[in-house]
């Protein structure tokens, strides 16, 4: 019985790139190789327009499950490779059609002749291939407008690809082509989604989390580590910086009027994150803010908070409502972790009536009454850094270390 031997990957948005497309293709190939490390027999050939993954006996379903999380892939097809002879093409098309799962009642044939010297024209091939499928199946009909299955045939010199099973990729651009940002990872629903969407634009992420023991627990800290771990499904690794924030928050609570404590806290977070970004050669800061969702996410608040950093602040969720954000969180696997009932530092010393239209002048005046410089320096110096990778990579490295 014929089985799938190849996976053909289509790039999507990458095809709009010009002279630097080779960089995008090379990065995508590198990311795919990393993602498929546990499949040693696979061979990958990345061309200007498409990527060919030769399975060499590896499980196509297991490989497909990994590919769907790689940014830069628009779609991919499971494919069979047959000689460019009519009878071989007909047999291959039938074999591919019979492997399609689900309730299939209709199909159509699509033929692309890259090899123009093939002795039959496209309009001659369609009834030959389609007729062979009809002769060898029951209760199946042709529907050229809305078929259950599209049997794609690509004819080349010497060989042809047969494809039925088309699957969606993650879209976007390959992680690593767009520089690096620092993501403020709070432990809530929003910030992991912001990190995911930032990676989708080809940007590598490192995460900064502020924790305030004993007001926040070790379980809250572990929750954020688990979120960062979940995000490694979409990249090679996530570096997480855990910043001790207790003294900063206690001082804010003591020195700053309660209505401005939330605003000043966010400004301190920005200052500390900018310092870490400088150390780590990041080019921007990403947050999970959604316009108007809470008091610190009004336009006035963002305007006042932004004052303290020269870095671009990326807000991927800015126009989304909560239900849209939750939907993405559920799809990417972070929602169930985010709703664990452990407090983060943003809920510590929460003011009863935070200012929704804070002014820069007032924030600067309140901050001028106390020198926060030393506290900021200590927070940066005492951060804990954890590098997280996919579970399979960690297991592979541990297995390697056991050999020595």
UniProtKB/Swiss-Prot annotation:
Pfam families: ThiI, ThiI_fer, THUMP. ATP binds at residues 184-185, 209-210, 266, 288, 297. Pathway: Cofactor biosynthesis; thiamine diphosphate biosynthesis. GO terms for molecular function: ATP binding; CCA tRNA nucleotidyltransferase activity; tRNA binding; tRNA-uracil-4 sulfurtransferase activity. It catalyses: [ThiI sulfur-carrier protein]-S-sulfanyl-L-cysteine + a uridine in tRNA + 2 reduced [2Fe-2S]-[ferredoxin] + ATP + H(+) = [ThiI sulfur-carrier protein]-L-cysteine + a 4-thiouridine in tRNA + 2 oxidized [2Fe-2S]-[ferredoxin] + AMP + diphosphate; [ThiS sulfur-carrier protein]-C-terminal Gly-Gly-AMP + S-sulfanyl-L-cysteinyl-[cysteine desulfurase] + AH2 = [ThiS sulfur-carrier protein]-C-terminal-Gly-aminoethanethioate + L-cysteinyl-[cysteine desulfurase] + A + AMP + 2 H(+). It is an enzyme of class 2 (transferase). The keyword tRNA-binding applies. GO terms for biological process: thiamine biosynthetic process; thiamine diphosphate biosynthetic process; thiazole biosynthetic process; tRNA 4-thiouridine biosynthesis. It is found in: Cytoplasm. One of its GO terms (cellular component) is cytosol. Residues 61-166 form the THUMP domain. The keyword Iron does not apply. Keywords: ATP-binding, Cytoplasm, Nucleotide-binding, RNA-binding, Thiamine biosynthesis, Transferase, tRNA-binding. Catalyzes the ATP-dependent transfer of a sulfur to tRNA to produce 4-thiouridine in position 8 of tRNAs, which functions as a near-UV photosensor. Also catalyzes the transfer of sulfur to the sulfur carrier protein ThiS, forming ThiS-thiocarboxylate. This is a step in the synthesis of thiazole, in the thiamine biosynthesis pathway. The sulfur is donated as persulfide by IscS. Belongs to the ThiI family. NCBIfam families: tRNA uracil 4-sulfurtransferase ThiI. This is Probable tRNA sulfurtransferase. It comes from Bacillus cereus (strain ATCC 10987 / NRS 248). The lineage of its organism: Bacteria, Bacillati, Bacillota, Bacilli, Bacillales.
């Amino acid at each position: 019985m014929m089985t799938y031997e190849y996976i053909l990957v289509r790039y999507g948005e990458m095809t709009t790139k010009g002279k630097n497309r080779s960089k995008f293709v090379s990065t995508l190939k590198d990311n795919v190789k990393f993602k498929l490390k546990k499949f040693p027999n696979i061979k990958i050939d990345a061309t200007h327009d498409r990527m060919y993954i030769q399975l060499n006996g590896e499980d196509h379903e297991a490989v497909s499950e990994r590919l769907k999380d790689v940014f830069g892939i628009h779609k991919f097809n499971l494919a069979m490779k047959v000689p460019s002879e009519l009878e071989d093409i007909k047999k291959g098309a039938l074999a591919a059609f019979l492997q399609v799962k689900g309730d299939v009642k209709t199909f159509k044939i699509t033929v692309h002749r890259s090899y123009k010297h093939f002795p039959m024209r496209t309009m001659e091939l369609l009834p030959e291939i389609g007729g062979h499928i009809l002769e060898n199946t029951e209760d199946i009909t042709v529907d050229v407008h809305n078929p259950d299955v599209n049997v794609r045939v690509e004819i080349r010199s010497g060989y042809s690809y047969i494809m039925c099973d088309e699957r969606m990729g993650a879209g976007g651009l390959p992680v690593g082509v767009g520089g690096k940002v620092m993501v403020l990872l709070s432990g809530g629903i929003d910030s992991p989604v912001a990190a995911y969407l930032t990676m989708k634009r080809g940007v590598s992420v490192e995460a900064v989390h502020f924790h305030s023991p004993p007001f926040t627990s070790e379980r809250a800290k572990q929750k954020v580590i688990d979120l960062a771990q979940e995000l490694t499904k979409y990249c090679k690794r996530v570096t997480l910086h855990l910043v001790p924030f207790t003294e900063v928050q206690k001082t804010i609570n003591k020195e700053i009027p309660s209505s401005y404590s939330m605003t000043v806290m966010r400004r301190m977070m920005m200052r500390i994150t900018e310092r870490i970004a400088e150390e780590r050669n990041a080019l921007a800061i990403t947050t999970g803010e959604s316009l108007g969702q809470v008091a610190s996410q009004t336009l006035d608040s963002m305007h006042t908070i932004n004052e303290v950093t020269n870095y671009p602040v990326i807000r991927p969720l800015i126009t989304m409502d909560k239900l849209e954000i939750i939907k993405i969180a559920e799809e990417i696997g972070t929602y169930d972790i985010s709703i664990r009932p452990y407090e983060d530092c943003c809920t510590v010393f929460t003011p009863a009536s935070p200012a929704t239209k804070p002014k820069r002048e007032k924030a600067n005046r309140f901050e001028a009454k106390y020198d926060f410089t030393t506290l900021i320096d200590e927070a940066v110096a005492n951060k804990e850094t954890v590098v997280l990778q996919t579970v399979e990579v960690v297991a592979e490295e541990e297995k390697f270390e056991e050999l020595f």
